[in-house]
């Protein structure tokens, strides 16, 4: 099976949830015997060693293109009847460039990751006349709506709510044109069923490489909280600022030695300014395994988002109990006994974290339960097998 996979970014190294999802689909499809060509947008310099490693699984086609929300793009979008999220991912000139890059190449299936790549996939189908599939890592318009709800008023609110409404309209129309759709949560699955009962839907959730992501023997810090995330997304930053300003002070009153470790590339100054004995903004690390092995609790104070937080799944695979908002934990059908504890305000975060810190046996048991939950429900082999088998059916 010759698969053209469309991605809005080069997904290596696998340093954030978005990249992890795309990279593992690419690798797992190749492992199942497919000839995969990964076509991606990029405007940065890629480490050639990392690129060579990616080429061990398939072919790479780079399209020089930036998807940054520049001031010029944002200004133009104020008067545009197409949402900026889709406008920046597709244009006629971009399409012509893609066609020139795949000229004389043969494909059986087009696989698109994220609705950002939906328009490109649909237009390629018109030329290549082959089936198209879309993996919905999230329902994008929901994220914009939740952001608007958080803002509530002002010019920024008016801009975001308009973009959300436009995106909902466009995204729903694009979704209906695919031969198969792969939602990653039950919430998204039900939404799509209600959108159009005739849609071909196959649940294919996120996953974890449980052989690679597992704890190592290292001394635990019973007072250490940790989060690993991408700081390119403003909602992750806002959630952490809220946690540091609202939750950490009340935790420090009871446990002065409490410590929050921040892992991830490009930590902004708005978070680095909190560096202290209680906040350690480490930044990018080659391997997150030692840090997750040392910490005792993973946190996810996210108030805007959709889809699944892959970093939460990885933390659970590392035998870490997780304290998260309902939105942060969305799409993960785990209970408290499975190691996923819900907290939606500062007092709930405080209570859940203190409960785990003060009861070592409970914390350890929740951690073991969390890993078992991931092994039984969230592996890449399970998820990508569903995608692979769905494509085989389309080609019969």
Question: Where would I find each of the regions flagged by the language model?
Answer:
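Short hydrophobic beta-strand element within catalytic cores of glycosyltransferases
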Residues: 311-314, 321-325
């Amino acid at each position: 099976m010759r698969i053209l996979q469309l991605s809005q970014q080069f997904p290596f190294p696998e340093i954030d949830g978005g990249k992890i999802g795309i990279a593992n689909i690419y690798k797992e499809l190749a492992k199942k015997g497919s000839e995969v060509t990964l076509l991606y947008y990029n405007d940065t310099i890629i480490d050639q060693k990392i690129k060579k490693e990616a080429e061990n699984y398939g072919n790479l086609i780079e399209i020089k293109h930036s998807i940054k929300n520049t001031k010029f793009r944002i200004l133009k979008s104020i008067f545009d009847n197409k949402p900026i999220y889709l406008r920046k991912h597709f244009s006629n000139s971009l399409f012509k460039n893609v066609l020139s890059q795949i000229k004389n190449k043969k494909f059986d299936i087009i696989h698109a990751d994220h609705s950002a790549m939906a328009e490109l996939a649909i237009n390629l189908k018109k030329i290549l006349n082959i089936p198209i599939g879309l993996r919905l890592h999230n329902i994008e318009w929901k994220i914009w709506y939740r952001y608007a709800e958080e803002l509530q008023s002002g010019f920024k609110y008016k801009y975001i709510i308009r973009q959300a409404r436009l995106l909902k309209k466009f995204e729903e129309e694009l979704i209906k044109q695919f031969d198969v759709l792969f939602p990653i949560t039950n919430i998204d699955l039900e939404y799509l069923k209600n959108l159009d009962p005739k849609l071909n839907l196959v649940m294919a959730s996120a996953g974890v490489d449980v052989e690679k992501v597992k704890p190592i023997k290292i001394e635990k810090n019973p007072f250490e909280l940790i989060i690993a995330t991408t700081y390119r997304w403003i909602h992750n930053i806002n959630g952490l600022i809220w946690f540091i300003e609202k939750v950490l002070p009340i935790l420090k009153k009871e446990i002065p030695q409490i410590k929050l470790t921040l892992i991830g590339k490009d930590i902004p100054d708005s978070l680095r300014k909190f560096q202290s004995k209680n906040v350690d903004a480490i930044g990018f690390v080659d391997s997150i395994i030692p840090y997750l092995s040392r910490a005792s609790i993973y946190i996810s104070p996210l108030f805007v988002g959709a889809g699944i937080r892959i970093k939460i799944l990885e933390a659970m695979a590392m035998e870490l109990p997780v304290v998260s908002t309902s939105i942060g934990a969305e799409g993960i059908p785990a209970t408290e006994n499975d190691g996923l504890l819900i907290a939606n305000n500062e007092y709930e975060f405080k209570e859940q974290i203190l409960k785990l810190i003060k009861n070592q046996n409970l914390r350890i048991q929740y951690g073991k339960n969390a890993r078992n939950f991931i092994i039984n429900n969230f592996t890449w082999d399970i998820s990508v097998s569903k995608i692979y088998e769905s494509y085989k059916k389309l080609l019969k």
